[in-house]
C-alpha cells in the first residue's frame, strides 16, 4: 500500500477516495460488516466451494453466520476496559483533579472500550481532542477526548520518513438535495479537515462521479491588497481553526504495527478463511439432516394408487402392501450414511485452529463457564495466557496514546493546570474476576509474621478502595476493636487469693 506523502490527493480532478487507499478502506468496510455479521454472500468463495463439493450442495447460502469476529473484538475490549484502568498523577492533588475532570467530560472508560474494538476490527483507532466553544456550558470550554472512525482518516507522511506523519486529514462525503433552475438535484460534497500541530484547516469541495471538483469558499472574509495597492476582501477555500494544542488533535491508538507502514494489522485476517470454511461445514451438515428429516420412499409398483382425476400415481400411506415373495422389494425409506462423524471431526479441527490463530485460545468459547465449572484465579489466568498476552501488546500502545491525549486535553480550559505526559501513570487491569481466597492468602502472608505491606495498602488492593477510603475503613476497624476490648470484662483469676495468703507465711 502506497503512503500519501503530500496533500495533492485533495486537488481538483483527483480521484476520490484516493486509489492508494482503496484497499485499506475496503478492509475497514469488510471488517465492519464482519463485526456486525452482515458481510453477506461472497460469490467468489461460493464458486470455489462448489468446485470442491459439487453441485449437490448448491443450496449453500451462508445461513449459518458464526460471528467469531465480534467475539474476538469484544473479548479484547473487555480485557482492557471492562475493569477500568486507574489514571493518576502520583500525589499531586491538583493534577489528579484535572485528570478526573478530563475522564468525566470524555466518558473515558466508554471511549476506551470503543477504541479497543476499533483497534481489533479496523486495526486503527483514532482518539481526537475536541475543543468546544466558549459558549458550551456543559464543558465550560474545556478540551475532552473523543473518537472518530478510521474510515475517514488519511494520514500524510514525510517523503523522507514514511513513519513520520506531517498532517492528519479527516475527510468524508455527504449528499444534499438542492434546487437548481427550479429542479431538484443531488449534490455530493467532500468535507475535510487538515490537521497540523496547534491548528487545523477545514474546507469543502464538490465531488462528481468519484472525482474532486471545485472548492466551496468557506473561510471568513479577510482583507488583502492587490498589485495596485487596493485593499479588498477575499474569501479563502480553507478556514483556519486554532486548537491551542502543542501537537495534533488526532492521536492514533493502534494494534500491531510493522516497520514498513503506519497502519496496523487487524485481528480478523488470520482466521477469516477458517470461519468461512466452518460456516460451509455447518451448512452441509444441516442439509444432510434436513434430507434425513424428509426422506424418499422406495417400494414395489403395487404400492402405488392411480388418481383418475389428476392422472398421477401416488403412494397412499397406511395401507397394507402384500409381498408375493421375499424377493419382492419392501416399502421403506431411502437413507444413506452422511459420514457426519468426519464432518464433526473437521469442525473440531477448525475450532482449534480458530482458537490458535485468533490468539484467544479456549477462552473464546467459554466452554468451562458454560459447563458450570469453577476455576480458581490461578487456573483462570493460565487459561487466559494467550488472550492476556495479545491484549498486553495493544495495551502498551494504548498506554502511550491515552497519556498523550490526557496531557493535550489539560492544555486547554483547565485554568493553566496542565499535566505533562511524563507525570501520568496508568494502572491497567486484566478484567478477570479476582479469587478472594487466593487474595486473602496473599494478604495474610504480606501482613503476617513477615509483613511486607501495610494493612491500609492491603485494604486498597483487596477492596479496590482509594487511599482515603482505605484509611477511613482501617480507622473504623481500629475504633470497633478498641471499643470491644474495653467492653469486655476481665476473666477472674481464681489463684489470686491463695497467692496473697501465701505472702505472709514463714517457712
Residue ranges and their predicted role:
Residues 121, 126-261:
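Extended, regular secondary-structure scaffolds
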Residues 473-507:
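Extended, compositionally biased alpha-helical segments that mediate assembly or anchoring
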Residues 1-167, 175-179, 499-507:
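Extended, helix-rich architectural segments
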Amino acid at each position: 500500500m502506497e503512503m500519501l506523502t503530500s496533500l495533492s490527493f485533495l486537488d481538483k480532478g483527483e480521484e476520490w477516495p484516493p486509489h492508494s487507499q482503496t484497499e485499506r478502506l475496503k478492509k475497514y468496510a469488510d471488517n465492519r460488516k464482519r463485526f456486525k455479521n452482515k458481510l453477506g454472500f461472497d460469490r467468489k468463495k461460493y464458486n470455489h466451494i462448489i468446485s470442491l463439493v459439487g453441485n449437490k450442495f448448491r443450496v449453500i447460502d451462508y445461513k449459518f453466520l458464526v460471528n467469531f469476529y465480534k467475539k474476538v473484538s469484544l473479548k479484547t475490549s473487555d480485557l482492557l476496559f471492562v475493569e477500568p484502568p486507574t489514571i493518576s498523577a502520583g500525589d499531586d492533588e491538583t493534577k489528579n483533579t484535572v485528570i478526573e475532570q478530563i475522564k468525566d467530560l470524555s466518558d473515558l472508560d466508554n471511549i476506551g472500550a470503543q477504541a479497543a474494538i476499533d483497534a481489533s476490527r479496523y486495526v486503527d483507532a483514532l482518539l481526537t481532542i475536541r475543543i468546544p466553544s466558549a459558549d458550551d456550558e456543559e464543558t465550560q470550554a474545556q478540551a475532552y477526548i473523543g473518537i472518530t472512525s478510521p474510515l475517514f482518516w488519511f494520514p500524510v507522511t514525510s517523503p523522507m520518513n514514511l513513519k513520520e506523519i506531517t498532517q492528519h486529514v479527516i475527510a468524508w462525503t455527504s449528499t444534499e438535495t438542492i434546487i437548481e433552475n427550479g429542479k431538484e438535484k443531488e449534490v455530493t460534497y467532500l468535507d475535510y479537515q487538515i490537521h497540523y500541530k496547534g491548528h487545523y484547516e477545514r474546507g469543502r469541495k464538490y465531488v462528481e462521479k468519484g472525482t474532486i471538483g471545485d472548492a466551496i469558499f468557506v473561510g471568513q472574509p479577510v482583507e488583502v491588497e492587490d498589485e495596485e495597492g487596493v485593499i479588498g476582501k477575499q474569501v479563502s477555500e480553507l478556514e483556519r481553526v486554532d486548537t491551542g494544542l502543542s501537537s495534533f488533535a488526532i492521536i492514533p491508538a493502534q494494534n500491531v504495527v510493522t516497520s514498513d507502514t503506519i497502519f496496523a494489522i487487524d485481528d480478523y485476517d488470520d482466521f477469516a478463511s477458517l470461519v468461512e470454511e466452518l460456516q460451509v461445514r455447518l451448512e452441509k451438515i444441516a442439509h444432510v439432516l434436513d434430507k434425513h428429516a424428509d426422506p424418499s420412499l422406495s417400494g414395489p409398483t403395487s404400492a402405488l394408487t392411480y388418481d383418475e382425476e389428476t392422472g398421477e400415481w401416488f403412494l397412499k400411506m397406511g395401507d397394507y402392501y402384500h409381498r408375493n415373495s421375499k424377493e419382492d422389494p419392501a416399502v421403506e425409506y431411502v437413507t444413506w450414511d452422511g459420514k457426519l462423524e468426519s464432518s464433526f471431526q473437521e469442525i473440531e479441527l477448525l475450532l482449534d485452529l480458530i482458537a490458535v490463530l485468533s490468539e484467544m485460545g479456549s477462552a473464546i468459547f467459554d466452554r468451562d463457564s458454560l459447563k458450570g465449572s469453577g476455576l480458581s484465579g490461578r487456573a483462570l489466568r493460565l487459561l487466559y495466557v494467550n488472550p492476556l498476552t495479545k491484549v498486553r501488546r495493544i495495551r502498551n500502545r494504548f498506554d502511550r496514546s491515552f497519556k498523550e491525549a490526557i496531557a493535550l486535553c489539560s492544555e486547554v480550559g483547565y485554568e493553566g493546570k496542565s499535566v505533562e505526559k511524563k507525570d501520568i501513570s496508568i494502572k491497567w487491569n486484566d478484567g478477570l474476576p479476582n479469587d478472594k481466597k487466593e487474595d486473602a492468602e496473599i494478604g495474610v502472608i504480606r501482613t503476617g509474621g513477615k509483613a511486607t505491606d501495610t494493612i491500609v495498602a492491603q485494604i486498597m488492593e483487596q477492596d479496590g478502595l482509594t487511599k482515603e477510603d482505605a484509611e477511613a475503613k482501617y480507622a473504623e476497624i481500629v475504633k470497633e476493636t478498641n471499643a470491644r476490648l474495653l467492653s469486655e470484662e476481665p476473666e477472674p483469676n481464681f489463684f489470686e487469693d491463695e497467692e496473697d495468703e501465701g505472702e505472709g507465711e514463714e517457712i
